[in-house]
């Protein structure tokens, strides 16, 4: 059942990517427009998704589940960072960053909610928050090779962290937002999948097919990101008792997502190989249509 849902959702995402590619090729979506869409996603859509996920009745069971999801997320990232560093070290910063940090926000959250319902975003939000924290600390060191480039303000003052704090406050206090605000946030949150995939389609239109499909090193990076890291994460979840059941599956879905779009954003921001980063994002996203359902099929036998 989970595999079938994932297969359907990843195919929908593929269609949306093609739509983005067509819009770009016909001149209806420009570079400036794609950057605006990324800003809308980062500063409006993702915060609405996270805050809405915490608008639920407080129970100790949910609090325990939230803490366990954070612990499992740390374990998953420990695997990803270790594998990426062993394979790439500091000599290939884009490959290291891209394989270590997945697309939990734009792909993981919508896939998790499609499989387990909107309430499951409650748990995957902690994964996205830890991802954000690691990107702005360890990720900066990878990209720049300089520890002094870490911006403490951006680590804690960013849309993901702020929305997480607001969401936790609403969850713990039990404060309910007015219906009109909740409905508005729901509408904005619904943009997550289509907007993110259309942007990825734009990225796809910017690369040469030859560069994308005939570069063995890109396939290696995709193999690391989509196969090695998810399977090792699955093994860790199998060993840890708390890794079994729904929270374990939620963690694995997020951990099995392709190279994050943040790889391209960080590469551009810090003067690294932006074109390679875009190729990594696009190829791994296309291949994830096949790999994610396969990984989840194996996971159902191991941790469900």
Where are these regions (language model features)?
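Alpha-helical transmembrane segments of multi-pass small-molecule/ion transporters
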Residues: 1-304
């Amino acid at each position: 059942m989970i595999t079938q849902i994932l297969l359907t959702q990843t195919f929908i995402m593929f269609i949306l990517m093609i739509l983005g590619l067509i819009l770009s090729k016909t001149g209806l979506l420009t570079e400036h427009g794609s950057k605006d869409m990324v800003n809308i996603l980062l500063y409006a859509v993702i915060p609405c998704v996270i805050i809405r996920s915490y608008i639920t009745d407080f129970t100790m069971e949910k609090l325990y589940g939230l803490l366990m999801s954070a612990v499992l997320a740390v374990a998953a990232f420990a695997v990803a960072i270790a594998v990426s560093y062993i394979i790439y070290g500091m000599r290939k910063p884009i490959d290291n960053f891209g394989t270590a940090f997945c697309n939990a926000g734009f792909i993981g959250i919508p896939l998790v909610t499609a499989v387990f319902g909107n309430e499951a975003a409650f748990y995957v939000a902690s994964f996205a928050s830890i991802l954000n924290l690691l990107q702005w600390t360890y990720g900066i060191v990878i990209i720049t090779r300089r520890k002094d480039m870490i911006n403490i303000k951006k680590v804690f003052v960013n849309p993901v962290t702020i929305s997480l704090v607001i969401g936790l406050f609403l969850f713990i206090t039990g404060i309910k937002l007015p219906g009109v605000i909740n409905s508005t946030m729901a509408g904005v949150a619904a943009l997550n999948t289509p907007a993110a995939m259309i942007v990825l389609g734009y990225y796809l239109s910017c690369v040469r097919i030859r560069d994308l499909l005939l570069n063995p090193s890109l396939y290696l990076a995709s193999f690391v990101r989509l196969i090695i890291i998810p399977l090792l994460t699955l093994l860790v979840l199998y060993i840890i008792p708390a890794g079994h059941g729904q929270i374990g599956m939620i963690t694995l879905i997020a951990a099995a997502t392709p190279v994050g779009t943040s790889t391209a954003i960080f590469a551009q921001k810090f003067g690294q190989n932006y074109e390679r980063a875009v190729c990594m994002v696009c190829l791994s996203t296309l291949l994830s249509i096949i790999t994610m359902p396969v990984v989840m099929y194996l996971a159902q036998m191991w941790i469900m």
